[in-house]
Amino acid sequence: MMPELQWPLSDSQRKEPRPLRRLDQGLRDHGFLRLEVPDFDWHRLHLVFTGSRQFFTQSMAEKRRFGYQSASENFGYQGVSEEALNPASGQFDAKEAFTMRNIRQRSGPLESWPSAEFQRLMIAFYEQCFELMASITSSIAVIAGLPEDYFQSRLSGENVTLRLLRYPAATSSSAEADQVLAGEHTDYGLLTFLFQDGAPGLEVQDREGVWQLVPAVANRVVVNVGDLMQRWTNDAYPSTLHRVRQQGNAVDRYSVAFFADPNSNVEVTPWPTFVTAEKPARYQTILSGEHIQAKLEASHRPLLSAGLE
């Protein structure tokens, strides 16, 4: 079962031993946990879901005006079968997405955005998630024996990405009753926050290789470890396989993901706290940007080969 803990945004409460210990244990044991964050503006999340529904229910021609241009830019609309999170499977994902990388840099020109109101809302929610990200990453730095501000310069927003997602409702076809809507994968960066609207679908692979359904609990954020965090912690925090599978939902499934991915020039090598004589460093130093870009390009390579991007 996925652990759940209450996460205070205030510095004084967060730095107490118990929240730090539970955060560390949850990330070690599962690579996934669910947070209750009393100070989080859940009403704004409701507005984000409303904006997401309004965008995705527009005509395809209107959505295509804001089309995804390239994996390097990582911004814009993608339709069904335009991404393969598990490229080795040869299957495209049955989802739509509106991806917003580095929103801070795009806070000016409106041509990339459906409307000024949509832009303002997404920027506000992005900054809200950024605050939550800072509170968690500073705590992880303390756990790892690093300066509390270790991530401040490494997570300025260059690769930090907000993503709106829509998965289609089930049809009467039995072949689609348990269809995989987003292929099994691990996330690429440091941490991911996932917000769900109530329709289930996320499945996480446990240590025995069994897929476990994650309930869609209102006013909670699911946090999972990414590949770079696994490397930094020398496998102490696992980047766990997960996917989205059709659960017979009668309505479309909407979710919002926030990817806390480090700046491109950040070197990632196992932290000394997690390296011992019994457990030597398992990874060579890599650049964050090279890893993230390679993963993004792999998930879009079928499209590039077909000349669709």
What does each model-identified segment do?
Residues 1-309:
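Peripheral, non-catalytic segments flanking oxidoreductase cores
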